[in-house]
Design a protein with these regions (language model features):
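Surface/interface-facing alpha-helical segments and adjacent flexible terminal/loop regions used
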Residues: 2-65, 69-187
């Protein structure tokens, strides 16, 4: 087999193998927790069982929902938590910016896309915060954000809702250090 054939075979093999995402090395506490959430966002349960779209939009929704869980659990707004939340969100926005650049969004539309994304993030965090105490309203907000073009499927919404409430129960009233420690085996 020639060198050219070997290279082509390798490229074709890689094309058909589902690649696991390559994560950069995260060392700071907010980066470590972000990486765990990012890894969780690739869990096929969201895409196969709940039928969330397996694309950049679906992954965005899953990551934002996990950010909400973290922020809700870190409701004590002392300076340490506020700094952590800000750094955590900045990491996500930096990653989102990098993703947009990788998929080729032009410089002409880049700032507009980032403004829209930032508004979407803050709007979702706000809506989830306002509705989390009322299960019906929370389900409506999940339906509207995660499955916007589908008729309501209460099974999917209820399963995701249960997932969110379980995570909140697991991490509620813990410091971010405790959340990082208890999520070592996966968020």
């Amino acid at each position: 087999m020639s060198i050219f054939q070997k290279k082509m075979f390798k490229k074709l093999s890689n094309f058909f193998i589902e690649q696991r995402p390559i994560y950069k090395e995260y060392k700071l506490p907010h980066e470590i927790l972000y990486k765990r959430i990012l890894i969780k966002s690739y869990d096929n349960w969201f895409y196969q069982k709940l039928k969330i779209s397996k694309d950049i939009n679906g992954r965005f929704e899953i990551i934002v929902l996990h950010i909400f869980i973290i922020f809700h659990c870190l409701s004590n707004n002392d300076k340490k938590n506020l700094t952590f939340k800000q750094s955590f969100l900045e990491t996500f926005i930096d990653e989102l910016e990098s993703t947009y650049r990788e998929i080729g969004i032009s410089d002409n539309t880049f700032s507009k896309k980032m403004k829209i994304a930032a508004k979407s993030i803050y709007r979702r965090l706000d809506v989830y915060s306002q509705t989390i105490e009322n299960i019906d309203l929370f389900n409506e907000s999940l339906q509207r954000n995660i499955w916007p073009l589908e008729d309501q499927d209460t099974n999917k919404v209820n399963e995701l809702n249960e997932y969110v409430y379980k995570k909140i129960k697991k991490y509620k009233n813990k410091s971010f250090d405790e959340i990082i420690e208890s999520s070592k085996q996966g968020f």
